[in-house]
C-alpha cells in the first residue's frame, strides 16, 4: 500500500475519532475518504465499522474513568438499538449500491438540516432530571438502530437527541452514552458486513489507529473544547460527500 494512503487514513481517522467523541456525524469523513480511495459505498460502510468499534471502546473507557458514563443505564438503552442494528444491517445487504447511495444522500441531507436547526438548543440538555426509558424512547432507539445498522452516518445526532431532549441528559453524558451505544451495537452489524465480504480490513484497521488516538484526546479534554468549528467542518464534508455520491451515480 502506498504510504500516502496510510497517512491519509491515519490523519482522517484521528479527526473522526476526535469529532465523534465530542459530537457526532464525523463518520462522513470516513465515508468520504473510503469512497475517494475507490471503495464501493456498501463496502465503505462495512469497513467504517472497524474503526467505530475501536474508537468507542476507547472513549467509553475514558468517560467511565471520569464518572461520566452510567454503564447500567447504557446497557438498557443498547437493547433496542441492537434490535434495530440487526434489521438495518441485513437490509443494507439486500439493496443495490444505487439504492444505498440514495439512502446515504438522504441521511447526509438530514444530518445537515440537524446541524442548521439551532443545535445549541438541544445540545445543552433540558435542565430536567433524568427520565426512565419509555415505550416511545424504546421505539425511537430501534429506529435509530435501523439507520445506524445500514447507513450509520449521523446516527449519533439521533442518539444525542433522544438522550438530551427525551431523557434530560447533558451533552457530555449524552455523548458518553452515544459512544457506548456505538461500541456495544456496531459489532452486530459488522459481523453481517463481514459475512457478505463487504469489509476492507487493511483500510479499516489503519483508519482505526487514528480513531483511537483521536477519541482518547477528545474524551480526555471534552469539557474544554467547543463545537462551533466542528459543525462548520461537518457541513463542508457533507457537501463533499454528496458531490462524490452524485458523481458516482451520474
Residue locations for each model-derived region?
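Transmembrane helix-loop junction
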Residues: 36-37, 43, 65, 89, ...
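Hydrophobic alpha-helical transmembrane segments in multi-pass integral membrane proteins
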Residues: 143-153, 189-197, 204, 241-250
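Small-residue hotspots at the loop-to-helix junctions and early N-terminal turns
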Residues: 42-46, 175, 179
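Transmembrane helix exit motif
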Residues: 58-66, 105-130, 240-250
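Selected transmembrane alpha-helices and immediately adjacent juxtamembrane segments
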Residues: 1-40, 125-175, 205
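Residues within membrane-spanning alpha-helices of integral membrane proteins
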Residues: 6, 49, 104-108, 112, ...
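Selective hydrophobic functional segments
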Residues: 46-99, 186-236
Amino acid at each position: 500500500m502506498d504510504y500516502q494512503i496510510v497517512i491519509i487514513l491515519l490523519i482522517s481517522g484521528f479527526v473522526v475519532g476526535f469529532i465523534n467523541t465530542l459530537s457526532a456525524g464525523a463518520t462522513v469523513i470516513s465515508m468520504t475518504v473510503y469512497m475517494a480511495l475507490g471503495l464501493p459505498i456498501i463496502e465503505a460502510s462495512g469497513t467504517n465499522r472497524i474503526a467505530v468499534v475501536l474508537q468507542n471502546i476507547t472513549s467509553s473507557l475514558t468517560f467511565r474513568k471520569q464518572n461520566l458514563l452510567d454503564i447500567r443505564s447504557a446497557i438498557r438503552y443498547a437493547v433496542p438499538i441492537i434490535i434495530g442494528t440487526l434489521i438495518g444491517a441485513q437490509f443494507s445487504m439486500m439493496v443495490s449500491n444505487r439504492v444505498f447511495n440514495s439512502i446515504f444522500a438522504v441521511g447526509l441531507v438530514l444530518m445537515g438540516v440537524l446541524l442548521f436547526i439551532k443545535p445549541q438548543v438541544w445540545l445543552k440538555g433540558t435542565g430536567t432530571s433524568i427520565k426512565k426509558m419509555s415505550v416511545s424512547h424504546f421505539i425511537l432507539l430501534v429506529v435509530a438502530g435501523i439507520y445506524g445498522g445500514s447507513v450509520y452516518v449521523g446516527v449519533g445526532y439521533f442518539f444525542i437527541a433522544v438522550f438530551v431532549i427525551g431523557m434530560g441528559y447533558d451533552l457530555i453524558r449524552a455523548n458518553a452514552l452515544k459512544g457506548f451505544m456505538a461500541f456495544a451495537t456496531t459489532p452486530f452489524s459488522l459481523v453481517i458486513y463481514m459475512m457478505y465480504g463487504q469489509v476492507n480490513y487493511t483500510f479499516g484497521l489503519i483508519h482505526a489507529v487514528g480513531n483511537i488516538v483521536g477519541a482518547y484526546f477528545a474524551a480526555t479534554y471534552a469539557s474544554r473544547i467547543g463545537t462551533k468549528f466542528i459543525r462548520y467542518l461537518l457541513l463542508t464534508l457533507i457537501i463533499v460527500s454528496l458531490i462524490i455520491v452524485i458523481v458516482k451515480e451520474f
